[in-house]
């Protein structure tokens, strides 16, 4: 199955419900990304969502739901455990003036991400094949995002060395992770919690923003 007009309409309408007006270029790139995700998922197992009709809401719109929170927080971003590229690819499309690094330890997934970068001509995107614990960039990131990556404790512990006191950690979760917050490392604190209302998604979605005391 390929991308259809219905997918395009669902994307535009859903983005509007999120308060986002997509440019023609952004719409084209997001749909091209969706097409690549559908194609490569058959062989590479990039996402457990097999039905292309569910991918607009559960992947594209879910990723776009954090756009307002990324918009106000820095120019240099890391997406940890990026997998099939969510939310990193949609965010790189929405913010072409900012830099996004997508990190994953799975070689098949990083090969897919490199292909997306090339085909969509995303000059602001870097793909890194590495374990997060051993990744050593030249400077700390302004923001670090994760989506269904790990517990908040592991997310904090594994990425501590990649941020600073000025960094915002954005963890996208389903149900509110109250138990995980109890296990947050002592040098991290919860800065804000936001309920995300994603068009077409029935389940709960939460964004937790963490800060670190250095």
Swiss-Prot record:
Reactions that this protein is recorded to catalyse: guanosine(527) in 16S rRNA + S-adenosyl-L-methionine = N(7)-methylguanosine(527) in 16S rRNA + S-adenosyl-L-homocysteine
UniProt-listed SUPFAM superfamilies: S-adenosyl-L-methionine-dependent methyltransferases
InterPro entries per the UniProt record, alphabetical: rRNA_ssu_MeTfrase_G (IPR003682), SAM-dependent_MTases_sf (IPR029063)
Cellular component annotations (GO), alphabetically ordered: cytosol
Binding sites annotated in the UniProt record for S-adenosyl-L-methionine: 81, 86, 132-133, 147
Keyword set includes tRNA processing: no
One Pfam family per UniProt: GidB
Enzyme class: transferase
EC number(s) stated in the UniProt entry for this protein: 2.1.1.170
Subcellular location: Cytoplasm
GO MF annotation, one: rRNA (guanine-N7-)-methyltransferase activity
rRNA processing as UniProt keyword: yes
Keywords: Cytoplasm, Methyltransferase, rRNA processing, S-adenosyl-L-methionine, Transferase
Domain of life of the organism encoding this protein: Bacteria
Similarity section: Belongs to the methyltransferase superfamily. RNA methyltransferase RsmG family.
Biological function: Specifically methylates the N7 position of guanine in position 527 of 16S rRNA.
PANTHER family: S-ADENOSYL-L-METHIONINE-DEPENDENT METHYLTRANSFERASES SUPERFAMILY PROTEIN
Protein name: Ribosomal RNA small subunit methyltransferase G
Species the sequence originates in: Ectopseudomonas mendocina (strain ymp)
Lineage, opening ranks: Bacteria, Pseudomonadati, Pseudomonadota, Gammaproteobacteria, Pseudomonadales
């Amino acid at each position: 199955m390929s991308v259809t007009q219905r997918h395009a309409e669902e994307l535009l309408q859903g983005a509007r419900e999120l308060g986002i007006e997509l440019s023609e270029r952004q719409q084209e790139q997001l749909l091209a990304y969706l097409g690549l995700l559908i194609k490569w998922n058959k062989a590479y197992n990039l996402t457990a969502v097999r039905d292309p009709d569910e991918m607009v809401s559960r992947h594209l719109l879910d990723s776009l739901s954090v756009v307002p929170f990324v918009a106000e927080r820095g120019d240099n971003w890391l997406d940890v455990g990026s997998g099939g590229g969510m939310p990193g690819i949609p965010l790189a499309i929405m913010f072409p003036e900012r830099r996004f690094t997508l990190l994953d330890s799975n070689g098949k997934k990083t090969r897919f991400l490199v292909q997306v970068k090339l085909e969509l001509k995303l000059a602001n995107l870097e793909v890194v094949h590495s374990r997060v614990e051993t990744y050593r960039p030249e400077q700390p990131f302004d923001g670090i995002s994760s989506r269904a990556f790990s517990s908040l404790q592991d997310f904090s512990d594994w990425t501590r060395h990649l941020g600073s006191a000025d960094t915002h950690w954005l963890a996208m979760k389903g149900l509110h992770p109250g138990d995980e917050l109890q296990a947050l490392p002592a040098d991290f604190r919860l800065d804000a919690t936001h309920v995300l209302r994603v068009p077409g998604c029935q389940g709960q979605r939460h964004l937790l923003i963490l800060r670190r005391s250095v």
